[in-house]
């Protein structure tokens, strides 16, 4: 795959205190981004969405997401606290 710098962070703002894991920097668009989002949601057993070129997965799943993205060949790093 690509060696793009992919960041996996956590956001709470605007979500009533419920956090989401946010994946940004993916070199994908359209159906490819949707397909990856679907795979990652299934892996985490959680809902989520694709918004403005980022993938949001409900809940705290950063470590699991970083591990899976690295297996897929992305240079994924955990960002934030």
Segment roles from a protein language model:
Residues 53-58:
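A generic structural motif
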């Amino acid at each position: 795959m690509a060696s793009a710098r992919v960041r996996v962070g956590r956001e709470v703002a605007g979500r009533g205190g419920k956090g989401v894991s946010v994946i940004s920097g993916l070199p994908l668009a359209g159906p490819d981004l949707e397909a990856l989002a679907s795979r990652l949601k299934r892996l985490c057993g959680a809902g989520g969405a694709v918004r403005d070129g980022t993938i949001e997965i409900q809940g705290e799943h950063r470590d699991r997401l970083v591990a899976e993205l690295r297996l897929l060949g992305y240079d994924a790093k955990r960002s934030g606290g």
